[in-house]
């Protein structure tokens, strides 16, 4: 008899850093939120749904998943980036805390976000 395991809910989001952004510049933003006194905002065309179980946001950079940060929520707002001084408006996925590097996992980049499943 085959046993069917319950389907796990996707417990993370996956985003892609645009190729136009240099990692050295991005590290400055990662450093700014390391102590959780600020959040990083990632612009998306629409907000994810059913996010109560989302714990992490994984980052794709140059064709690889390279690490994750703690997911703290979503917003629909206007703000000025404290690192780049650029004005932003729209829908955002928010994350904060230290960036946890992982062994690279090949993954093709995309726009927006995707739901992702991880195991500790």
Label each residue range with its predicted role:
Residues 1-53, 61, 80, 86-91, ...:
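Compositionally biased, charged N-terminal/linker segments
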